[in-house]
């Protein structure tokens, strides 16, 4: 198909997605990375956030806790630490996780601050993936 590329998302749990996509935006370490068909070869890390991709004009979202992306030969392969499609996110659980992390961060005593910050970032990514 003209104007598309193969997008594949893989996590330790297995294959999450394989689609012919028109566009993908990834959370990179220095900002978002946008990829269109026939993109130049690329290998990069990705951060905690939301992967947004377009298939048949419709934007879909996947929450990720980081990983790597490889782009070559009109194929985009994302090796994600975790990958949860937005429609599968339990929004109530994600909101509760966000609240717990925020509470931990306000107390700051007897906790691993970095761990609480990462938990908050993951919860926010899941919430953002679940919402339109």
From Swiss-Prot:
User: What are the cysteine partners in each disulfide bond?
Assistant: none
The family database entries (Pfam families) matched by this protein are listed as:
ATP-synt_DE, ATP-synt_DE_N
Any idea which GO molecular function terms this record carries? Answer: ATP binding; proton-transporting ATP synthase activity, rotational mechanism
The record's section on Gene3D superfamilies has: ATP synthase delta/epsilon subunit, C-terminal domain, F0F1 ATP synthase delta/epsilon subunit, N-terminal
**Which domain of life does the UniProt lineage start with?**
Bacteria
Membrane topology for this entry? Answer: Peripheral membrane protein
State the compartments where it is located: Cell membrane
Assign the protein's first listed, main location to one coarse class.
Answer: membrane
Q: Which UniProt keywords apply?
A: ATP synthesis, Cell membrane, CF(1), Hydrogen ion transport, Ion transport, Membrane, Transport
Gene Ontology annotations for the cellular component aspect, listed alphabetically: plasma membrane; proton-transporting ATP synthase complex
Described function: Produces ATP from ADP in the presence of a proton gradient across the membrane.
UniProt family annotation: Belongs to the ATPase epsilon chain family.
Cite the record's note on assembly.
F-type ATPases have 2 components, CF(1) - the catalytic core - and CF(0) - the membrane proton channel. CF(1) has five subunits: alpha(3), beta(3), gamma(1), delta(1), epsilon(1). CF(0) has three main subunits: a, b and c.
Q: What is this protein called?
A: ATP synthase epsilon chain
Naturally occurring in which organism (per UniProt)? Desulfitobacterium hafniense (strain Y51)
Q: Gene for this protein?
A: atpC
